[in-house]
Amino acid sequence: MSVTGPIWPPIWTEQDFADHSNVPRGTLSDFIHWYGLLRKWNARINLVAPKEIDQFWRRHAYDSWQLNAHLPKKWDRLVDLGSGGGFPGLSLGIFSKQMGAGEVYLIESIRKKASFLKTVTRELGLPITVHAARIEAVLPLEADVLTARAFAPLPRLFDYATPHLKPTSVLILPKGESADKEIKDARAHWHFDVERFKSVTDPSASILRVMNLRRKGA
């Protein structure tokens, strides 16, 4: 799996996505199917902002796909918090299907959105389990990898994530311009190591790779 360097045209087509992500034909077909379902369901429930639906291929699909480059070489269980329209959870499920990797668990408390996630999972035959529940109501999942996109600032995100982590867990977290402040705020209450990578879709954004997370005083 590979991605190219940062470029930001306003609107991408499915071919732009294919060219920059280097996905095989079958994987591209899964993304096309997902996009069709997203457009259909978005007319009834708010999965993405209407003005962003035409930006699916860069703003959502490629932005999610870039996380694959930061995953551990081997993982068995990946948990995505607040999965919404499936970014990045469904994308990671498609990647796992392609690569024969582990199981993906999506947690989404809004039942209509969870129904959408289940529909895409079923129709694409993805290795995904959808939990239609609040995060704190889900039994500990012991994730090897945990992701969340546009979900919560780091201090609160760590609170939600901790019950589902192991000492060896890795968190892969897309963040925007507030990343520096969020890291500083989180260090007031948490010990952790963090690596930061530039986003390939947004020059002001980054991908955080967090390890060895533990609460101070614990």
Predicted regions and their residues:
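Class I SAM-dependent transferase core
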Residues: 1-75, 79, 111-126
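Residue-level signal for inorganic ion chemistry
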Residues: 38, 92, 174-175
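Conserved SAM/SAH cofactor-binding pocket of Class I
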Residues: 65-148, 158
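Short glycine-rich anion-binding loops that position phosphate/pyrophosphate groups of nucleotides
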Residues: 84, 150-153, 177
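Conserved beta-strand segments of alpha/beta enzyme cores
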Residues: 103, 127-129, 170, 191-195
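A short glycine-rich, Lys/Arg-flanked "PGG" loop and its adjoining helix->strand segment in the class I
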Residues: 158-170
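Conserved beta-strand signature within the Rossmann-like core of class I S-adenosyl-L-methionine
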Residues: 168-178
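Active-site capping/gating segments
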Residues: 178-218
